[in-house]
Amino acid sequence: MSCNILYLCGGYYNYDEGYTPEFKGKDNFQGQIIHPQKWPEDLDYLDKKVVVIGSGATAVTIIPAMAEKVSHITMLQRSPTYYMAPPDRMWLDEFLKKYTTDKIGYFLVRWKNILLGRFFVSQIKKKPLKYKEMLINGVKEHLGDNYDIDKHFTPKYMPWDQRLCLVPNGDIFEAINSGFMKLSFVLYNISLLSCVS
Protein backbone atom coordinates (compact mmCIF):
# COMPACT_ATOMS: atom_id res chain seq x y z
CA MET A 1 0.00 0.00 0.00
CA SER A 2 1.22 3.52 -0.70
CA CYS A 3 -0.38 6.90 -0.08
CA ASN A 4 0.37 10.59 0.31
CA ILE A 5 -1.76 11.04 3.43
CA LEU A 6 -2.71 8.39 5.99
CA TYR A 7 -5.34 9.12 8.64
CA LEU A 8 -5.27 6.87 11.68
CA CYS A 9 -8.51 7.69 13.44
CA GLY A 10 -8.37 5.43 16.44
CA GLY A 11 -9.52 8.02 18.96
CA TYR A 12 -11.74 7.35 21.94
CA TYR A 13 -14.57 9.69 20.95
CA ASN A 14 -17.90 8.31 19.81
CA TYR A 15 -20.03 11.16 18.50
CA ASP A 16 -23.14 9.00 18.13
CA GLU A 17 -23.12 8.03 21.78
CA GLY A 18 -20.75 9.99 24.02
CA TYR A 19 -19.29 8.30 27.08
CA THR A 20 -21.53 8.38 30.14
CA PRO A 21 -20.22 6.70 33.27
CA GLU A 22 -22.49 4.41 35.24
CA PHE A 23 -23.63 6.35 38.31
CA LYS A 24 -24.96 4.41 41.27
CA GLY A 25 -28.38 5.81 42.17
CA LYS A 26 -29.04 7.13 38.65
CA ASP A 27 -32.40 5.35 38.41
CA ASN A 28 -33.64 6.97 41.63
CA PHE A 29 -32.26 10.43 40.85
CA GLN A 30 -35.18 12.85 40.45
CA GLY A 31 -33.32 15.49 38.48
CA GLN A 32 -32.34 15.47 34.82
CA ILE A 33 -29.09 13.97 33.55
CA ILE A 34 -28.09 15.62 30.27
CA HIS A 35 -25.11 14.64 28.13
CA PRO A 36 -23.74 17.66 26.19
CA GLN A 37 -23.81 15.67 22.94
CA LYS A 38 -27.53 15.04 23.41
CA TRP A 39 -28.46 18.54 24.59
CA PRO A 40 -32.23 19.10 24.13
CA GLU A 41 -33.02 22.40 22.42
CA ASP A 42 -35.89 23.06 24.83
CA LEU A 43 -33.91 22.34 28.03
CA ASP A 44 -35.26 24.56 30.80
CA TYR A 45 -32.67 25.32 33.46
CA LEU A 46 -34.01 28.72 34.56
CA ASP A 47 -33.49 29.19 38.31
CA LYS A 48 -32.40 25.57 38.77
CA LYS A 49 -29.40 24.18 40.60
CA VAL A 50 -27.04 22.62 38.06
CA VAL A 51 -23.98 20.41 38.46
CA VAL A 52 -21.54 20.16 35.55
CA ILE A 53 -19.34 17.10 35.88
CA GLY A 54 -15.83 17.74 34.60
CA SER A 55 -13.44 20.63 34.20
CA GLY A 56 -12.39 20.41 30.56
CA ALA A 57 -13.32 22.32 27.42
CA THR A 58 -17.00 21.35 27.44
CA ALA A 59 -17.42 22.40 31.08
CA VAL A 60 -15.73 25.78 30.63
CA THR A 61 -17.95 26.41 27.59
CA ILE A 62 -21.23 25.33 29.20
CA ILE A 63 -20.80 27.02 32.57
CA PRO A 64 -20.53 30.67 31.41
CA ALA A 65 -23.34 30.10 28.90
CA MET A 66 -25.72 28.80 31.60
CA ALA A 67 -24.62 30.99 34.51
CA GLU A 68 -26.99 33.92 34.03
CA LYS A 69 -30.12 31.74 34.11
CA VAL A 70 -29.43 29.18 36.85
CA SER A 71 -29.91 29.72 40.57
CA HIS A 72 -26.52 28.07 41.17
CA ILE A 73 -24.02 26.06 39.14
CA THR A 74 -21.34 23.71 40.48
CA MET A 75 -18.31 22.46 38.58
CA LEU A 76 -17.64 18.98 39.92
CA GLN A 77 -14.07 18.05 39.06
CA ARG A 78 -12.00 14.98 39.86
CA SER A 79 -8.87 17.04 39.44
CA PRO A 80 -8.22 20.63 38.45
CA THR A 81 -7.19 21.29 34.85
CA TYR A 82 -4.55 23.65 33.47
CA TYR A 83 -6.19 26.59 31.72
CA MET A 84 -4.75 29.01 29.23
CA ALA A 85 -6.72 32.03 28.04
CA PRO A 86 -5.44 33.20 24.63
CA PRO A 87 -7.35 35.80 22.63
CA ASP A 88 -9.74 34.22 20.13
CA ARG A 89 -8.28 36.43 17.40
CA MET A 90 -4.61 37.23 16.91
CA TRP A 91 -3.29 40.24 15.05
CA LEU A 92 -1.29 38.09 12.61
CA ASP A 93 -4.39 36.09 11.67
CA GLU A 94 -6.34 39.30 11.05
CA PHE A 95 -3.46 40.76 9.01
CA LEU A 96 -3.21 37.66 6.80
CA LYS A 97 -6.97 37.54 6.39
CA LYS A 98 -6.98 41.16 5.22
CA TYR A 99 -3.96 41.10 2.89
CA THR A 100 -4.02 37.61 1.34
CA THR A 101 -6.55 35.38 -0.36
CA ASP A 102 -8.70 33.11 1.82
CA LYS A 103 -6.82 30.04 0.64
CA ILE A 104 -3.35 31.46 1.34
CA GLY A 105 -4.44 33.08 4.61
CA TYR A 106 -5.98 29.83 5.87
CA PHE A 107 -2.87 27.86 4.86
CA LEU A 108 -0.50 30.28 6.64
CA VAL A 109 -2.62 30.57 9.78
CA ARG A 110 -3.01 26.80 9.97
CA TRP A 111 0.77 26.27 9.75
CA LYS A 112 1.40 29.07 12.22
CA ASN A 113 -0.95 27.34 14.68
CA ILE A 114 0.65 23.92 14.13
CA LEU A 115 4.21 25.21 14.56
CA LEU A 116 3.33 27.42 17.52
CA GLY A 117 1.53 24.50 19.18
CA ARG A 118 4.45 22.12 18.64
CA PHE A 119 6.92 24.72 19.94
CA PHE A 120 4.78 25.40 23.01
CA VAL A 121 4.39 21.69 23.87
CA SER A 122 8.13 21.04 23.41
CA GLN A 123 8.98 23.98 25.69
CA ILE A 124 6.54 22.78 28.36
CA LYS A 125 8.06 19.29 28.25
CA LYS A 126 11.58 20.77 28.64
CA LYS A 127 10.69 23.11 31.52
CA PRO A 128 7.47 21.83 33.12
CA LEU A 129 7.87 23.64 36.46
CA LYS A 130 8.41 26.99 34.75
CA TYR A 131 5.31 26.56 32.60
CA LYS A 132 3.24 25.20 35.49
CA GLU A 133 3.98 28.43 37.34
CA MET A 134 3.20 30.48 34.23
CA LEU A 135 -0.17 28.75 33.70
CA ILE A 136 -1.19 29.05 37.37
CA ASN A 137 -0.13 32.72 37.38
CA GLY A 138 -2.30 33.23 34.30
CA VAL A 139 -5.32 32.01 36.26
CA LYS A 140 -4.32 34.23 39.21
CA GLU A 141 -4.19 37.24 36.88
CA HIS A 142 -7.78 36.53 35.83
CA LEU A 143 -9.23 35.69 39.26
CA GLY A 144 -7.08 37.63 41.70
CA ASP A 145 -7.39 36.56 45.32
CA ASN A 146 -11.09 35.65 45.09
CA TYR A 147 -10.58 31.91 44.70
CA ASP A 148 -8.48 29.20 46.26
CA ILE A 149 -6.23 28.80 43.20
CA ASP A 150 -4.15 26.04 44.81
CA LYS A 151 -7.21 23.89 45.53
CA HIS A 152 -9.39 24.54 42.47
CA PHE A 153 -6.95 25.48 39.70
CA THR A 154 -3.67 23.68 40.45
CA PRO A 155 -3.45 20.12 39.08
CA LYS A 156 -1.28 17.51 40.80
CA TYR A 157 0.24 16.56 37.44
CA MET A 158 2.57 18.54 35.17
CA PRO A 159 1.35 20.49 32.12
CA TRP A 160 0.75 18.26 29.09
CA ASP A 161 0.74 15.07 31.17
CA GLN A 162 -2.93 15.61 30.36
CA ARG A 163 -4.45 17.99 27.84
CA LEU A 164 -4.36 21.71 28.46
CA CYS A 165 -7.71 23.49 28.30
CA LEU A 166 -7.86 26.62 26.15
CA VAL A 167 -10.37 29.21 27.31
CA PRO A 168 -10.53 31.81 24.49
CA ASN A 169 -10.65 35.32 25.95
CA GLY A 170 -10.92 33.82 29.46
CA ASP A 171 -14.72 33.95 29.37
CA ILE A 172 -15.18 31.59 32.32
CA PHE A 173 -12.93 33.83 34.41
CA GLU A 174 -14.93 36.89 33.33
CA ALA A 175 -18.12 35.12 34.36
CA ILE A 176 -16.65 34.19 37.75
CA ASN A 177 -15.39 37.74 38.36
CA SER A 178 -18.67 39.36 37.31
CA GLY A 179 -20.14 38.37 40.66
CA PHE A 180 -23.29 37.43 38.76
CA MET A 181 -22.18 33.86 38.39
CA LYS A 182 -23.25 31.65 41.27
CA LEU A 183 -20.49 29.08 40.93
CA SER A 184 -18.92 26.52 43.23
CA PHE A 185 -15.94 24.27 42.59
CA VAL A 186 -15.95 20.84 44.21
CA LEU A 187 -13.31 18.12 44.01
CA TYR A 188 -15.01 14.73 43.91
CA ASN A 189 -15.26 11.08 43.32
CA ILE A 190 -18.94 10.34 42.69
CA SER A 191 -20.16 7.33 44.64
CA LEU A 192 -23.94 7.89 44.65
CA LEU A 193 -26.42 10.22 42.93
CA SER A 194 -29.19 11.49 45.15
CA CYS A 195 -31.61 14.38 45.07
CA VAL A 196 -31.45 16.81 47.98
CA SER A 197 -33.62 19.91 47.90
Question: Where on the chain are the PLM-derived regions?
Answer:
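Conserved beta-strand-loop-beta-strand element in the redox core of flavoprotein oxidoreductases
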Residues: 1, 31-33, 189-197
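Rossmann-like dinucleotide-binding core of oxidoreductases
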Residues: 6-148, 181-182
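A conserved short coil-to-beta-strand element within the FAD-binding core of flavoproteins
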Residues: 42, 152-156, 164, 179-196
